[in-house]
Amino acid sequence: MSTFRSPEVTGSTVRRLAALARDPRPGIRASAAAHRHAPAELLHALAEDEDTRVRVALARNAWAGPDLLDRLAGDAVAVVRRWVAVHPNTPAQARDRLAQDEDPQVRAVLAMVTSSR
């Protein structure tokens, strides 16, 4: 039985993702933010994107690192912080801040996730 393996990440892949991240359309930038092979520096740059959809895509990216999630835990938009609250890679210090979040839904989502772990 063969197993599926993801193709190797090439310089070409990274260049295409960088081009997508600069696209004027937020949906295209969000697709770059959600990509599993997007390099960390690209993801961190997208954390500054003005469009909430892009930052939500970052917070939902299964391969997002703890440092990026810690940064997104301070996002001005509550829906981004809610996605950070449910991400399994969110570090403890970010969870502690989210537990004191001004938005009751962020706190509720975090409490629900924490109680189920």
Describe the function of each predicted region:
Residues 1-117:
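Alpha-helical scaffold segments
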